[in-house]
Amino acid sequence: MRLNPIKIKIYNEDEFVKKAVYFSELFEEAALYFSNKKKDTSLPKFYKDYDFIFAFNSTKSIKASEDSLTKLNKFISKYSFWKFGFFSYNLKNEVQNISSKKQNTFNIPNMFFFVPEFIIYKKNSQVYFDSENSSIDSHYILKEINSIKLKKPKKFNLNFRCTQKKPNYLKKIKQIQEYIKRGEVYELNYCMEFKTTQQICAEDFFLSTNKKCMAPFSCFFKFENLKILSFSPERFLKKINDKLISQPIKGTIKKSNNFYQNLKLVNALEKSEKDISENVMITDLVRNDLSITAKRNTVKVEELCKVFS
């Protein structure tokens, strides 16, 4: 194992990160994370560490749908190198006295993590290469990535359809209204699945969408035969020593190509009662969830209803 990561040079970062996405096709497991905003000042600097992290190939992995967190803790304790992975929606059934009957279409486990063969990441304007295996040649890996020929960007016209039929949707809305009348909830998010059967290149689609979204928490994740594409504006959790940070977001508005029009839109969003209500709701929800395991009086809301763009 290397004592320290190796500093490497990348001469065209935009091209390199695109090629890295296509390079992931060679491996069954890979995780590529993008911060996207190189000069972003909207997030506190303390909360942003990396511009990108690319992890390739699995040397060890773990997946579980029972006792997942205990198994993960043992896995983390056993291996000292980086770990990458995900928790799926149904993990909630293990930690809360609740359950759902949603169909697990892709047979995704409650938890999956892997130790990569090597990683490439950018931090504080410097790019690094790291691996547990000192025989892995960083120059060879970089040469392989740089040798990839970039494809001409494709235009996508995907037709998504909701998997829920209209009568069932209206029935669910009436149930929600009854919950609100009875005081069981005062506000909630009702999520539905949309799908398409069109064949696409996931790597092409990720790069095309990522260029448009430029979300600060974007990810391209490969797991067995599954590819997960995520473009999120919010952070679920970040751990710094004994401090946990969550940055949920609610309330959105369209963006304009005109700077002055954008200022008006920001002002409208800041004054929107609906969006303020949603933002306060999700902040209160996260605060309550963190309070379950946090030391008393340590959960603090550092910022509320600030607009990020």
Predicted regions and their residues:
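Extended alpha-helical targeting/anchoring segments
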Residues: M1-S309
